[in-house]
């Protein structure tokens, strides 16, 4: 089994309905991506001449996560392009699927956040993420 990132739902993550507020799931996905990259690239990937940005993201929701639930996020690369890659992020609480995020990321030069220029995804990143 691949990488799994676990996040305990905080009170502040929930809306008036008592469930995780929709945009918070994107924060969970972002945190899982950061942790996944840090684990497979063994440290600060920005110091390894790699950075990335979200080009597109969507979530198909299935069921709610609530305060104190532990959300498990399991990423997998589903497509490689020259300077981009797609990731599917499975989200669950226990055996219950709560949703699936689909994201397109672009590889950029570290430090070019104002006017990012897409650059080829480094081979070490491709190898590490599979």
Located regions from the model:
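Preference for bulky hydrophobic residues occupying beta-strand positions
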Residues: 7-9, 59, 75, 89
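HotDog/MaoC-like acyl-thioester-processing domains
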Residues: 3, 66-67, 78-130
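Hydrophobic beta-strand-centered segment that forms part of the acyl-chain substrate-binding groove
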Residues: 36-72, 76-84, 98-100, 106
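Hot-dog-fold acyl-thioester-processing enzymes
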Residues: 1-55, 110-130
